[in-house]
């Protein structure tokens, strides 16, 4: 679209070429404004930030040239379409007074020029060509002013440029004004260009072409500069790195290269790139992938270490808990055994007490039997004594004697040993009583006689 706009512009401007050819030499010879010095006074190997960079085959191509001056070996300046505006001097002065309070005065021109020069970035626009055009004095002055090629001058890229010698400072200010208008830049007194990156992202639309009438050839007008870059600069291309998808095959070759270089710690992006030898692979791709590979390699190891540490801690905790449980179980077992021993001792003591009680009971039983036998014996003796005391008369006495004699004469059956023993004891107890009775009986019989 931009190339088409340029072609249309050149077609429109070619119509005004014939009218301005006569005035071009006069304008170039009499209008070497301080802009020429402002643009060309640059150190060697410095380039201006405003250069049209398109393919050489496109129409309307403007190329810088090498300067032939003795003080400067090389300088690149504006190569753009410069033309006069249809606005009047009063309107431009009002416009400059209102919208450009920051533009420098003629006395402080050198300070502003140095400030603008410091803001130029040589890495944004490149390419210098040394084609020169053959012409007269006006053509050589024009080429020194704009560093244009012969083809550019012949094609009519420079049209309707004219101003008087009294408007040097005003033309300088107007040039800066239209430069800022075209680029939509806020050029401050320190020559800062904060919106320079936006120029290369979205190209600006082509400006309408204004032509200067013959009556306005000597009137100081405003200049507009068309600055558009169709190709991104190397700096912006370096900043906008191309993304690349790592396929499994690329990753395998990357891993092999890293292994050959003795691991990811010793491997460098440059060496890995040389070993891989893949087209389109840059050192930035290798560097980022190497960093990711290092992170991916060390993260699982750290996780495994953490897992092992956690497992060891768990094992230690389990072993401690098991040891504590075993100790508690052993203590409980010892306490249970001790209690069992105490219970057994108590049982033995109870058995001994029972045995002693049984012995005592047996002794008491024997003693009671003896007492019962003695009571029986005493009962028999009392009964026999009561019978003897209660006998009725004396007649009965001889009968009793006879009976006793008969009893004594009659044989008696043998008594058992126990009865004999009891009788012997009874006899022993009763013998003194019998004697007393017999004595009493005998005394009673003697007085009767």
UniProtKB/Swiss-Prot annotation:
Record keywords: Coiled coil, DNA-binding, Nucleus, Transcription, Transcription regulation
Motif LHEQLE, chain ranges: 347-352
GO CC, one annotated term: nucleus
Pfam families documented for this protein: Myb_CC_LHEQLE (PF14379), Myb_DNA-binding (PF00249)
PROSITE patterns recorded: HTH_MYB (PS51294)
InterPro entries: Homeodomain-like_sf (IPR009057), Myb_CC_LHEQLE (IPR025756), Myb_dom (IPR017930), Myb_dom_plants (IPR006447), PHR1-like (IPR046955), SANT/Myb (IPR001005)
Region annotation Coiled coil: where it falls in the sequence: 334-354
Entry's family note: Belongs to the MYB-CC family.
NCBIfam families with a match to the protein in the record: myb_SHAQKYF
PANTHER family the record matches: HTH MYB-TYPE DOMAIN-CONTAINING PROTEIN, MYB FAMILY TRANSCRIPTION FACTOR PHL11
Protein name: Myb family transcription factor PHL6
Gene label: PHL6
């Amino acid at each position: 679209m931009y190339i088409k706009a340029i072609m249309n512009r050149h077609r429109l401007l070619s119509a005004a070429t014939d009218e301005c050819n006569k005035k071009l030499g006069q304008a170039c010879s009499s209008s070497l404004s301080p802009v020429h010095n402002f643009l060309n006074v640059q150190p060697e190997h410095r380039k201006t930030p405003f250069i049209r960079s398109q393919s050489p085959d496109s129409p309307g191509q403007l190329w810088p040239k090498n300067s032939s001056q003795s003080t400067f070996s090389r300088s690149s300046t504006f190569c753009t379409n410069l033309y006069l505006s249809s606005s009047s001097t009063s309107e431009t002065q009002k416009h400059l007074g209102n919208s450009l309070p920051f533009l420098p005065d003629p006395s402080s021109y050198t300070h502003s020029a140095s400030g603008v020069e410091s803001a130029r970035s040589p890495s944004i626009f490149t390419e210098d060509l040394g084609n020169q055009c053959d012409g007269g004095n006006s053509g050589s002055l024009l080429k020194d002013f704009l560093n244009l090629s012969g083809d550019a001058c012949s094609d009519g890229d420079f049209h309707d440029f004219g101003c008087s010698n009294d408007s040097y400072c005003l033309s300088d200010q107007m040039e800066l004004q239209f430069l800022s208008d075209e680029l939509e830049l806020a050029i401050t007194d320190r020559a800062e260009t904060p919106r320079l990156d936006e120029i290369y992202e979205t190209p600006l639309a082509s400006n309408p072409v204004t032509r200067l009438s013959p009556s306005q050839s000597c009137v100081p007008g405003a200049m507009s500069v068309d600055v558009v870059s169709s190709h991104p600069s190397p700096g912006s291309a370096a900043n906008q790195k191309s993304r690349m998808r790592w396929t499994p095959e690329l990753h395998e070759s990357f891993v092999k290269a890293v292994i050959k270089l003795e691991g990811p710690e010793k491997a460098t992006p440059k060496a890995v790139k040389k070993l891989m030898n893949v087209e389109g692979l840059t050192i930035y791709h290798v560097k980022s992938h190497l960093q990711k590979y290092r992170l991916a390699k060390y993260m699982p190891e750290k996780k495994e270490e953490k897992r092992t540490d956690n497992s060891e801690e768990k094992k230690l905790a389990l072993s401690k808990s098991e040891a504590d449980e075993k100790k508690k179980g052993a203590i409980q077992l010892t306490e249970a055994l001790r209690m069992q021993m105490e219970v057994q001792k108590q049982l033995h003591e109870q058995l001994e007490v029972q045995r002693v009680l049984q012995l005592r009971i047996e002794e008491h039983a024997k003693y009671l039997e003896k007492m019962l036998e003695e009571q029986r014996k005493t009962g028999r003796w009392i009964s026999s004594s009561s019978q003897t005391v209660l006998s009725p008369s004396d007649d009965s006495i001889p009968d009793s004697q006879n009976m006793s004699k008969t009893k004594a004469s009659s044989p008696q059956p043998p008594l058992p040993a126990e009865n004999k023993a009891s009788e012997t004891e009874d006899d022993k107890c009763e013998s003194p009583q019998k004697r007393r009775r017999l004595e009493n009986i005998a005394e009673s019989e003697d007085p009767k006689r």
